[in-house]
């Protein structure tokens, strides 16, 4: 329910003459939206939204054209499944990857998710946990770590990674420290000179490219990033 609770308050859905298309990969998406908007959960039913609403359900790996953007989809590891989206237009690309758990054995060069995010200008990455938390007490919770995000961004040559889906219990002070530790990890790794066999120029240990990511940021309400 926490994934959908903003929909009943989506103002454009109540405006007559608006046309709204919900895109997703969950086959049960229409049923889920209807069920959450009924008493006793919510006083207004989904059918009372005045806009003209339709659904388009896609399969993982599909590529569709939406509002001038090429949109690609990928299935992700999360309880109940989740899906990541890659948006491409005018030579720029943004990947939105929420509610995804990338495990320790995924830190290998042939991991398919790396191809999905490769060369992205911006990767919006779900990472509420430290590396130790993600592989320990919070394993199987469906989320990833800051270190994993930086590792993937480096190996896939992503220019900018912004971390989001913060721990609800985290304070502003904790989040600032989390960002600082993430940037420190990148700085230390870039300044660690380790011999690498058969490495291409700019490529570090285990497929890491020391040139990427160029920037790390932390998401917040109202954040605007130009790509």
Protein language model features and the residues they cover:
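Binuclear metal-dependent hydrolase catalytic cores
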Residues: 1-95, 103, 114-115, 173-227
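Cap/insert and terminal regions of metallo-dependent hydrolase folds
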Residues: 104-208, 212-214
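Conserved acidic
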Residues: 99
């Amino acid at each position: 329910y926490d994934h959908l609770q903003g929909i009943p308050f989506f103002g454009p859905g109540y405006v007559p003459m608006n046309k709204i298309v919900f895109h997703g990969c969950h086959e049960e998406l229409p049923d889920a939206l209807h069920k959450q908007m009924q008493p006793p959960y919510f006083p207004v039913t989904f059918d009372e939204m005045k806009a003209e609403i339709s659904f388009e359900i896609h399969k993982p790996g599909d590529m569709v054209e939406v509002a001038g953007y090429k949109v690609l989809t990928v299935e992700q590891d999360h309880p109940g499944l989740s899906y990541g989206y890659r948006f491409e237009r005018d030579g720029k690309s943004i990947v939105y990857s929420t509610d995804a758990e990338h495990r320790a054995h995924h830190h290998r060069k042939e991991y398919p998710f790396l191809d999905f995010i490769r060369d992205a200008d911006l990767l919006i990455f779900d990472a509420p946990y430290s590396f130790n938390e993600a592989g320990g007490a919070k394993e199987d919770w469906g989320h990833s770590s800051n270190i994993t995000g930086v590792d993937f961004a480096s190996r896939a040559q992503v220019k900018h990674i912004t971390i989001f889906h913060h721990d609800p219990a985290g304070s502003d002070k904790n989040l600032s420290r989390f960002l600082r530790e993430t940037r420190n990890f990148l700085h230390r790794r870039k300044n660690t000179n380790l011999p690498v066999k058969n490495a291409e120029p700019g490529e570090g240990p285990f497929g890491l490219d020391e040139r990427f990511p160029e920037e790390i940021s932390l998401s917040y309400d109202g954040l605007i990033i130009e790509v």
